[in-house]
Amino acid sequence: MAKSVLIVNPQARGGFAQKKWPVLEPMLRDALGVIDVQFTKRAGDGTPMAKAAVEAGADLVVAMGGDGTASEVASGMLAAFAGSARSEPSCAFGYLPCATGGDLRRILHTPSELADAAAAIAKAKPRPIDAGRIDYIGHDGKPCSGYFINVASCGISGLVDHLVNEGSKALGGKATFFVASLRATFRYKNALVKVRLDDQPAYEERIYTLAVSNGAYFGGGMHIAPEAKIDDGIFDVTTLGDLSLVEALRLGGLIYKGEQGRLSKVSSKKARRVVIEPVNPDEKVLLDVDGETPGRLPATFTLLPGALLYRG
């Protein structure tokens, strides 16, 4: 196997990579050198492909696609590291954005043009970034676990992702998520949950959304955690509390600017481990994990400091 592996989602951004591959391939090979190119065929493929690449001895694994593809690839790498005797990541992670949302590109300060992003990967020295592990309940009711590199949340955000992923993304990232958020606002009922941050006493709160943030943006440009940094060794925990419909609609004009703190029912805290469960065990509170909806509460979010080496 080549020491560098490129995992491409050919369907990202309306099939951009697939349509432009004859032009993109020589440019990418020129920038990245000898590289093993692999194409995903369906959602979720990036995780086992990245895991296999790390286990086969790759030095660099690059995700090319949207935020979901990047999260899949990072998750596969983290799974490989977890199954290894090594205490540090053995392989670097790179990202070439072809995104609907583009949140991860903002957080990692990745150039928006593919040629520039590839050049950055080729020149940059790896730097450690944090990740998160999540243990939760899958849609089939069975315990599951996974990883995230940006934001994992619960509440209306899970419904928004469900609406985004079942519909068309032809409007582009920000508009797609904004329309889905409006639709969800009129359908969602605030959930009563119990929250524990690290070893602090648990508390109950009715939530519109509760976000455990490693990065600062989610939902196609929503600035959910303005103080969050992907390499600071701690989660930012943002609670959008028991918002009324009017407050929820007002939130839409604030959150893209990171000004949701102007609402009295919004709070922000710090933690390295977060446990959230529904007060009513029969209530299904959906999760949003890096833009996907893998399941529901209860969930435990655990920080993995410096778990990935990022090049770009």
What are these regions (language model features)?
Residues 1-64, 71, 115:
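ATP/NTP phosphate-donor binding region
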Residues 46, 68-73, 103, 129:
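Short glycine/serine/threonine-rich phosphate/pyrophosphate-binding segments
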Residues 18-20, 74-77, 106-108, 223-224:
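Short amphipathic alpha-helical segments
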Residues 153, 157, 211-225, 292-293:
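Glycine-rich phosphate/pyrophosphate-binding beta-alpha loops
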Residues 31, 55, 78-208:
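Catalytic core of DAGKc-family lipid kinases
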Residues 13-17, 219, 310:
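Short N-terminal binding/cap micro-motifs at the start of the first secondary-structure element
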Residues 197-199, 204, 223-224, 229-230, ...:
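ATP/nucleoside-binding phosphotransfer catalytic cores, i.e., glycine-rich phosphate-binding loops
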